[in-house]
Curated annotation (Swiss-Prot):
Native organism: Nidirana pleuraden (Yunnan pond frog)
Family affiliation: Belongs to the frog skin active peptide (FSAP) family. Pleurain subfamily.
Tissue specificity of this protein: Expressed by the skin glands.
Main location: secreted
Signal sequence, start to end: 1-18
Record protein name field: Pleurain-A1
Compartments reported by the entry: Secreted
Entry GO CC: extracellular region
Function statement: Antimicrobial peptide. Has activity against the Gram-positive bacterium S.aureus ATCC2592 (MIC=15 ug/ml), the Gram-negative bacteria E.coli ATCC25922 (MIC=60 ug/ml), B.dysenteriae (MIC=120 ug/ml), H.pylori NTCT11637 (MIC=30 ug/ml), and the fungus C.albicans ATCC2002 (MIC=30 ug/ml). Has little hemolytic activity on rabbit red blood cells.
Alphabetical list of Pfam families matching this protein: FSAP_sig_propep
Keywords: Amphibian defense peptide, Antibiotic, Antimicrobial, Cleavage on pair of basic residues, Cytolysis, Disulfide bond, Hemolysis, Secreted, Signal
InterPro entries noted in UniProt: EF_Hand_1_Ca_BS, Frog_antimicrobial_propeptide
Disulfide bonds: 63-69
Keyword set includes Signal: yes
Length: 69
């Protein structure tokens, strides 16, 4: 019974270490800065939409309101 506990404790300890190393490796990959996060992608999409579409949309609305088309 005691050897079983030692074996389980050893497996738990080794598993904890390997999980910790995997997490560190994953964090190191994320620090590269090469991949954009979801939030950055959303911001860029919103910015592109504002810069490209809204001025045209406002021109169309003004054109229809004032019948200057």
């Amino acid at each position: 019974m005691f050897t079983l506990k030692k074996t389980l404790l050893l497996l738990f300890f080794l598993g904890t270490i390997s999980i910790s190393l995997c997490k560190q490796e994953r964090d190191a990959d994320e620090d590269d800065g090469r991949k954009m996060t979801e939030e950055e992608v959303k911001r860029s999409i919103i910015t592109m939409t504002k810069e490209a579409k809204l001025p045209q949309l406002w021109k169309q609305i003004a054109c229809r309101l004032y019948n200057t088309c």
